[in-house]
């Protein structure tokens, strides 16, 4: 019966588990793990190489050294298994138990665990409410602590130095007890009554007023509750028993020459054992106190070093001055257990080799060298050889393969057929870095790669290497074929556009084919079909570029899928007609009837995919490639030095610029301009000269004039090779051609400033030594930048993946009605991103109506595809509310409707799709293309003259957004609100452009008026800020006393006098409290009110305001009472590129953030303190007013008496994301981060869908702070996952209790990763020690929800195909958890049940 049970136990070894709990180990638990106590520091006998008894490698404790053989050799072989040898005490079993059997050391004196002592905040310190400094002094025997005060005046936990202790002893005798060392701390911890303490603290919390004290108590309360609920005991933070790691995990390996290589842990354990034994001896001898104390301190230090070397004091070093690697070092960092062995493993059945081009391959194939294939597919070959009876045993098969017999190759062909392999190129930045192909056997040793997948791999053939992996199991092969095949990865997951677009040679070939040339041989011929064109081309009757007329046949596919043929005659060229042969049926000929540049080809493939689906697109892409290569070869496009045509005008342009520079130089020498102005002017002159030269050059290159058949001059695009390469998008750009044939232009110094003498030469003319030297700066900086960039970009990707890794689609629809409002992105009047691109592939959250009616155009929950977007554009909708992951209500994960279309597949996203990782990869992958630098606004850019008007680009009608205005005497509108915007609407009601206009803008047109393109419709003075009156009347000066609060200045030229208000700092003591203002009064002298309010019309004047009016003057509505000079804001460095993206995702506060209004209300200024102004906002409803101190030098946008809305900008600057979230809500912060990140990527021409950024933002917003706890378990001010609060609140509401209220919090990605619910994921990211300490104290359990945790414990991930597996498991578990009725059974029944169980277990295996 016992054997049966043992067998059962072995059966259920791979028990399914659903979580991992971490906690503190009690001394008894450690003893229960142990197989014996390690008493001696010896390791192995250096003569016999046998482990020493009771030593660190003892066979009796840890198990036999050889399989099924005891140490003395009495029992050998399998038949004795389980016997314990009576001579040497070793159990006869497998030697692998030495990897799992632990030992222990009984410590002679307790020792504090350094993690709970030193990991901040110190858990032991928090528990005892003592400072870390004090506890350390007790532990390391520097002072005493009172444990039992007895009847004395001492307090428990009071520190006593040696002298104080002796004094107390004299005074009180043995009334009290005080100790030092870990024993003292142990007793203090043991004496804590958790329940009582918790109750006490919960009671005193509400009455605490001081913020710091409250925080401290809350922290302590949380710790105590964690201990209480998890069942950990505080005294377990002090070790009495030390576990010993199994010996095979800290091996001792003999090297040749009689030396040993050993794990550092053995040294560390040896020190502990030595000191422990010495301490035991000293205690037995009753040695003097001071010696024992010293030994105890040394023991404490050696245990510290074993657990975490270097955490306290100097690290213990080995013989070679290198710090020893402790247990903590084993798990943390890039080389630690987590990142080296659990998250990244080496893989068998893999090989790597150099890659080369396979231009004849199909898209789903790769060329695999025979040698590699033979090695990789060995087991399959052996199996086949045996199955065919060609070899009798595996050994024979092995021999055959080694000899490379002819049959082996036949078998290999068969094995490889339909067996995909995976190709990977490092660095794998996104999921397209590993794709599956069908291998084609080739001679040679290099892997052949299909040219079209190079873009996805970012591969080129200059020596890149790639790795091959073989999917072994049937499931793996199936997944490789169905999901990872290169033909299934045509669209990029980052933006949904084709990623297999042709580039370089292919583009050049197709472009060359589709160009037209005037007077080409065969021009003007008529052809009845494309076949006839082909004959004419083949016989040489017509050349490739001749303009001809051809009758073509097109297949049109209707909405219901029926195909109809249409014939028409088109004007085209021979080349384009030939291209139409490979065009799949159902695509219009117009798609190829144009110059086929890279953009056009990409669009062609995209159209093909959307209209005809995957299969046709793949075949078409291959055909395009073959055609492109063929015609690129035929074209013979090559670059010769004469192709770089230098424009004749260059020399005159350069001479003109030099003359201008001389003129400026003279002005500078005669003192008319400053050095800075001169420098800026010179740079401007050269920059514009360069522009002119390059313009002349491009005009010269791009067209040539020919005489056509009718004898008339006609311009045609040039066939210059360099121009064709740039124009088609195959290689090079206008900027590069400019350096070849124009002039190199201005160069930068290493510090980023521009050198004012440009390089006038170009590469064709050649550079002289100085010019070459100047050029080297930029080149070197570029290389240094690239190296830094790669590391930074990789780290950003890692943080992004870590924060988003557990986000998976888990349901169809969460049912939320919330969403984000999408409008076209308009900047400075231009539409940067039309609405179509922003909503394509998203789901509608709120019905979209036909404009101006109540009819629904697109109902809620519609997935907007291309056809729907066409419809929206047709009805000129310019605002759609779409579902977003940020507003998704699913608890753990998101729903498909909130995510929308799977960009790489083009349909609604599937369950189990790991959208978090995809988002992180999409944002991180282009990271290396972003720049690293911060831009200094200087030179040409900074003097972009301040804008002072709006000139419209499109005709339409004028519309104002959140603007208040008054009409002045000229009948023009004057804006009197901030953050107003002015938009131009076309006749369909679509917004074409939008501009921000400041306070005091004068509009030339009324609202709704029609404007023509090019009209100037708004003017303002950029250098002063007016104060506009909203009522007419006569003015009264209040508190404006000459010489006290103001001075009069007279302009010498005009003789006009004006009043200047003095700044508070410049006034005498009399004027400090005065508030100069202008009051408006009616004819009878009574106060006038601002229209629509009870507020008297009075305008406060800030310091340095200029008033051009006299007291009692009459004014009209819309007049300026005063002007405040604006200092141009200091030139700030604009952080760009990668650092900017990192700052946004880390939610870092900018240096001088914009100050936003915390509440809505009226502005006033209170009493000033030195260097600061006191800003007061009084709400209209008479609630609590809000005060804020603002430094004097900040440029405020608001004036006394103005009304502001909550979240409005008070002082300019970069806005902080946290402020936006707090004051304007979640939608605004999402929009802000998305737009800011997109700006950086757009600048580099990288397209990323907004969805991906939103996914990361959702993860940044997943925590919240409890504002009031209601009836919940949460503490006020506690940081909790939003989903947990929502679940708890739902339960509370169901029970009719008060739910908790919370405020969302924005965390940077690093913080958010570390704050995740899963401690395994957080520990494997960063700060391993801190995370594990916290988790252990709280007794946290990890439910293994995310991908990372599951990879670490070695399971399928709960995403993709693993999602189904986990789902079925969870469903089964839910079923199993239903309560079961238990009946008592007899012993015989139990035996019968056991037998059944065994049969069942056997059948399941």
From Swiss-Prot:
Zn(2+) 1 binds at residues 70, 72, 85, 88. Zn(2+) 2 binds at residues 814, 888, 895, 898. The keyword Transferase applies. Keywords: DNA-directed RNA polymerase, Magnesium, Metal-binding, Nucleotidyltransferase, Transcription, Transferase, Zinc. Binds 1 Mg(2+) ion per subunit. Binds 2 Zn(2+) ions per subunit. One of its GO terms (cellular component) is DNA-directed RNA polymerase complex. Mg(2+) binds at residues 460, 462, 464. InterPro entries: DNA-dir_RpoC_beta_prime (IPR045867), DNA-dir_RpoC_beta_prime_bact (IPR012754), RNA_pol_asu (IPR000722), RNA_pol_N (IPR006592), RNA_pol_Rpb1_1 (IPR007080), RNA_pol_Rpb1_3 (IPR007066), RNA_pol_Rpb1_3_sf (IPR042102), RNA_pol_Rpb1_4 (IPR007083). CDD domains: RNAP_beta'_C, RNAP_beta'_N. GO terms for molecular function: DNA binding; DNA-directed RNA polymerase activity; magnesium ion binding; zinc ion binding. Its EC number is 2.7.7.6. Disulfide bonds: none annotated. It catalyses: RNA(n) + a ribonucleoside 5'-triphosphate = RNA(n+1) + diphosphate. One of its GO terms (biological process) is DNA-templated transcription. SUPFAM superfamilies: beta and beta-prime subunits of DNA dependent RNA-polymerase (SSF64484). Its cofactor is Mg(2+); Zn(2+). It comes from the Bacteria. DNA-dependent RNA polymerase catalyzes the transcription of DNA into RNA using the four ribonucleoside triphosphates as substrates. HAMAP family: RNApol_bact_RpoC (MF_01322). Belongs to the RNA polymerase beta' chain family. The RNAP catalytic core consists of 2 alpha, 1 beta, 1 beta' and 1 omega subunit. When a sigma factor is associated with the core the holoenzyme is formed, which can initiate transcription. This is DNA-directed RNA polymerase subunit beta'. It comes from Shewanella sp. (strain MR-4). The lineage of its organism: Bacteria, Pseudomonadati, Pseudomonadota, Gammaproteobacteria, Alteromonadales.
């Amino acid at each position: 019966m016992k054997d049966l049970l043992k067998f059962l136990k072995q059966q259920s070894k791979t028990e399914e588990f659903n979580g991992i709990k971490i906690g503190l180990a009690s001394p008894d638990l450690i003893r229960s793990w142990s197989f014996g106590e390690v008493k001696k520091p010896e390791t192995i006998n250096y003569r016999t190489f046998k482990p020493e008894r009771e030593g660190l490698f003892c066979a009796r404790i840890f198990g036999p050294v050889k399989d099924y053989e005891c140490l003395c050799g009495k029992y050998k072989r399998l038949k004795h298994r389980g016997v314990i040898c009576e001579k040497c005490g070793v159990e006869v079993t497998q030697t692998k138990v030495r990897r799992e059997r632990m030992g222990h050391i009984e410590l002679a004196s307790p020792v504090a665990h350094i993690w709970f002592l030193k990991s901040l905040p110190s858990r032991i310190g928090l528990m005892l409410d003592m400072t870390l400094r004090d506890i350390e002094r007790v532990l390391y025997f520097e002072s005493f602590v009172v444990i039992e005060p007895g009847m004395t005046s001492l307090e428990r936990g009071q520190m006593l130095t040696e002298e104080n202790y002796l004094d107390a002893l004299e005074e009180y005798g043995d009334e009290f007890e005080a100790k030092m060392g870990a024993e003292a701390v142990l007793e203090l911890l043991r004496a804590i009554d958790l329940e009582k303490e918790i109750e006490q603290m919960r009671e005193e919390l509400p009455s605490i007023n001081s913020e710091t004290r409250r925080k401290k108590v809350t922290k302590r309360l949380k710790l105590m509750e964690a201990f209480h609920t998890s069942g950990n005991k505080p005294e377990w933070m002090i070790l009495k028993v030390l576990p010993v790691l199994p010996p095979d995990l800290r091996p001792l390996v003999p090297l040749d020459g009689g030396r040993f290589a050993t794990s550092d842990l053995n040294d560390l354990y040896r020190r502990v054992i030595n000191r422990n034994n010495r301490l035991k001896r000293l205690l037995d001898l009753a040695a003097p106190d001071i010696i024992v104390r010293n030994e105890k301190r040394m023991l404490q230090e050696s245990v510290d070093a074993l657990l975490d070397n270097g955490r306290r004091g100097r690290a213990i070093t080995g013989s070679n001055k290198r710090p020893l690697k402790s247990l903590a070092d084993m798990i943390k960092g890039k080389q630690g257990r987590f990142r080296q062995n659990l998250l990244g493993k080496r893989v068998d059945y893999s090989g790597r080799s150099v890659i080369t081009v396979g231009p004849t391959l199909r898209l789903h194939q790769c060329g695999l060298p025979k040698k590699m294939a033979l090695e990789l597919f060995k087991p399959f070959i052996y199996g086949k050889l045996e199955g065919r009876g060609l070899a009798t045993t595996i050994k024979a098969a092995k021999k055959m393969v080694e000899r490379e017999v002819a049959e082996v190759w036949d078998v290999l062909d068969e094995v490889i057929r339909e067996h995909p392999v995976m190709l990977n190129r490092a660095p794998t930045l996104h999921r397209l870095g590993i794709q599956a192909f069908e291998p084609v056997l080739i001679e040679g040793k290099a892997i052949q790669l299909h040219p079209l997948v190079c873009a996805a791999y970012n591969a080129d053939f200059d020596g890149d290497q790639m790795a091959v992996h073989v999917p072994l199991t049937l499931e793996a092969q199936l997944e490789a074929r169905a999901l990872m095949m290169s033909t299934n990865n045509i669209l990029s997951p980052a933006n949904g556009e084709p990623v297999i677009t042709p580039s370089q040679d292919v583009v050049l070939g197709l472009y060359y084919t589709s160009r037209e040339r005037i007077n080409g041989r065969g021009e003007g011929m008529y052809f009845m079909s494309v076949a006839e064109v082909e004959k004419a081309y083949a016989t040489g009757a017509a050349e490739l570029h001749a303009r001809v007329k051809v009758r073509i046949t097109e297949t049109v596919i209707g909405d219901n899928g029926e195909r109809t043929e249409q014939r028409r005659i088109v004007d085209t060229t021979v080349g384009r007609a030939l291209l139409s042969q490979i065009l799949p049926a159902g695509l219009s000929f117009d798609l190829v009837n144009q110059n086929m540049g890279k953009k056009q080809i990409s669009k062609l493939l995209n159209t093909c995919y959307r209209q005809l689906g995957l299969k046709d697109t793949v075949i078409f892409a291959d055909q395009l490639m073959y055609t492109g290569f063929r015609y690129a070869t035929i074209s013979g496009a090559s670059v010769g030095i004469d192709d770089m045509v230098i424009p004749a005008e260059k020399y005159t342009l350069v001479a003109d610029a030099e003359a201008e520079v001389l003129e400026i130089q003279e002005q500078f020498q005669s003192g008319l301009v400053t050095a800075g102005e001169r420098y800026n002017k010179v740079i401007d002159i050269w920059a514009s000269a360069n522009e002119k030269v390059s313009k002349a050059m491009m005009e010269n290159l791009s067209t040539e004039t020919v005489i056509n058949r009718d004898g008339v001059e006609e311009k045609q695009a040039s066939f210059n090779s360099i121009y064709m390469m740039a124009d088609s998008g195959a290689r090079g750009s206008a900027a590069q051609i400019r350096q070849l044939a124009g002039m190199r232009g201005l160069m930068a110094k290493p510090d980023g400033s521009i050198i004012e003498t440009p390089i006038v030469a170009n590469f064709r003319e050649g550079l002289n030594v100085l010019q070459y030297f100047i050029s080297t700066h930029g080149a070197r900086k570029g290389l240094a930048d690239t190296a830094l960039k790669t590391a930074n970009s990789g780290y950003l990707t890692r943080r992004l993946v870590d924060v988003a890794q557990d986000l998976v689609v888990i349901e169809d629809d969460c049912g939320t009605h919330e969403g984000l409002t999408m409008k076209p992105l308009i900047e400075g009047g231009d539409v940067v991103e039309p609405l179509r691109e922003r909503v394509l592939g998203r789901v509608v959250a709120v019905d979209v109506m036909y404009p101006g009616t109540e009819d629904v155009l697109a109902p809620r929950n519609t997935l907007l595809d291309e056809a729907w977007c066409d419809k929206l554009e047709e009805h000129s909708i310019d605002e759609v509310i779409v579902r977003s992951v940020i507003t998704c209500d699913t608890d753990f994960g998101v729903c498909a409707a909130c995510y929308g279309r799977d960009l790489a597949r083009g349909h609604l996203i599937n369950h189990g799709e790991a959208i978090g990782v995809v988002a992180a990869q999409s944002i991180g992958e282009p990271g290396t293309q972003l720049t690293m630098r911060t831009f200094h606004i200087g030179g040409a850019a900074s003097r972009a003259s301040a804008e002072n008007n709006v000139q419209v680009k499109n005709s339409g009608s004028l519309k104002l957004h959140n603007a208040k205005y008054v009409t002045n005497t000229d009948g023009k509108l004057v804006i009197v609100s901030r953050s107003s915007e002015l938009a131009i609407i076309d006749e369909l009601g679509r917004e074409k452009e939008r501009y921000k206009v400041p306070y005091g803008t004068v509009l030339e047109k009324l609202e709704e008026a029609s404007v023509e393109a090019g009209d100037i419709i708004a003017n303002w003075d950029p250098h002063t800020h007016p104060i506009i009156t909203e009522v007419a009347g006569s003015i009264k000066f209040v508190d404006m006393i000459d010489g006290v609060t103001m001075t009069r200045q007279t302009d010498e030229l005009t003789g006009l006098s004006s009043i200047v208000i003095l700044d508070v700092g410049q006034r005498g003591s009399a004027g400090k409290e005065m508030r100069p203002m202008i009051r408006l009064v009616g004819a009878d002298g009574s106060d006038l009110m601002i229209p629509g309010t009870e507020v008297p019309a009075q305008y406060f004047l800030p310091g340095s305001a200029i008033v051009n009016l006299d007291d009692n003057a009459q004014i009209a509505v819309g007049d300026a009472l005063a002007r405040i000079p604006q200092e141009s804001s200091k030139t700030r460095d604009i952080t760009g590129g990668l650092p900017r993206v990192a700052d946004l995702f880390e939610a870092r506060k900018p240096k001088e953030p914009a100050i936003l209004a915390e509440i809505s209300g009226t502005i006033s200024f209170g009493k000033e303190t030195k260097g600061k102004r006191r800003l007061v906002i009084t709400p209209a409803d008479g609630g609590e007013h809000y005060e804020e101190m603002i430094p004097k030098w900040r440029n405020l946008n608001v004036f006394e008496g103005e009304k502001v809305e909550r979240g409005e900008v008070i002082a300019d600057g970069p806005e902080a994301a946290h402020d936006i979230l707090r004051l304007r809500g979640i939608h605004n912060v999402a929009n802000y981060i998305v737009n800011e990140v997109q700006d950086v990527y757009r600048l580099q021409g990288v397209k990323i869908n907004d969805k991906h950024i939103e996914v990361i933002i959702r993860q940044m917003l997943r925590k919240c702070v409890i504002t009031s706890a209601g009836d919940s378990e949460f503490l006020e001010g506690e940081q909790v996952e939003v989903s947990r609060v929502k679940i708890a609140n739902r339960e509370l509401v169901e029970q009719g209790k008060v739910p908790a209220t919370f405020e969302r919090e924005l965390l940077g990605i690093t913080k958010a990763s570390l704050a995740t619910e899963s401690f395994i994921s957080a520990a494997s990211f960063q700060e391993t020690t801190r995370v594990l300490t916290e988790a252990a104290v709280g007794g946290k359990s990890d439910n293994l929800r995310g991908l990372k945790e599951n990879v670490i414990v070695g399971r399928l991930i709960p995403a993709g195909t693993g999602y189904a597996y986990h789902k079925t498991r969870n469903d089964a578990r839910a079923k199993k958890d239903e309560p079961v009725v238990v009946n008592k059974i007899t012993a015989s029944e139990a035996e019968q049940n056991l037998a059944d169980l065994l049969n069942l277990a056997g059948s399941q295996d």
